[in-house]
Amino acid sequence: MEANAYSRLWFETFLRTQSPEWTAREVAFVARQAPQPAYRTVLDVCCGEGRHAIPLAERGYDVTGLDRDGAALFAARERAADLGVAARFVEGDMRDLAASVAGPFDVCVCLWQSFGYFDAATNEDILRQMGDLLRPGGRLILDIYHPGFYAAHQGERTVERNGRAITISERLNANHLTVDIDYGPDAAPDRMEWELYTPGAIQTIAARHGLRTVLACTLCDETQLPTPDMIRMQLVFERML
């Protein structure tokens, strides 16, 4: 099966069952780390159906969302139109950002573990491209998995979403995470793969490309340092002058 294909069933099962309260927390974190009016233009890389892009636009940001999934972008445009929100949604490949969007932006966000899909060199180049699309002093905000969490939490588990029992198998090999999702006999499975980065590793990569670390935290809480006890961490970088 193709990894990281994100089936329609995946969107229905995981994206659309995300807590509105958690989405609001993520968006509020972005707004604190990139406050208006100093930061206004936002590029949301791997925006999906606009879960973050639309509420950021509702806050007054000038938002461009980029994703490779045309169906997800169609849903994002429909939802934005229904809400009367002005946001642009562009189809494109995160490996070649300049082919689809033109900077500079004040902010680039890549949230909900949407970074690390490729090999180490390609991932680093994507981070470089995101930084290059920022104005001097612009900020890049990443929300990514902590490899230490998965080092201690591998194996198989069953969850229930939308009345469906789903088996999730998670395996970490070095820093490569593979997640297999079995929806049952009536649906094709999904596979997700990522390269994961420790806080220090991703900060070192960012520094190589002129991005200084402003903040590393977890739970979208500036007072909480990243820890292997928590699945996610947020990092804020600033493009140096």
Where are these regions (language model features)?
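Class I SAM-dependent methyltransferase SAM/SAH-binding core
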Residues: 53-96
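Conserved class I S-adenosyl-L-methionine
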Residues: 1-37, 39-46
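C-terminal lobe and adjacent flexible extensions of AdoMet/dcAdoMet transferase-like proteins
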Residues: 201, 205-241
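A short acidic, Gly/Pro-enriched loop at the edge of an enzyme's catalytic core
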Residues: 99-107
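A short glycine-rich, Lys/Arg-flanked "PGG" loop and its adjoining helix->strand segment in the class I
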Residues: 124-136
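SAM-dependent methyltransferase
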Residues: 121, 137, 141-205
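Conserved SAM/SAH-binding loop
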Residues: 49
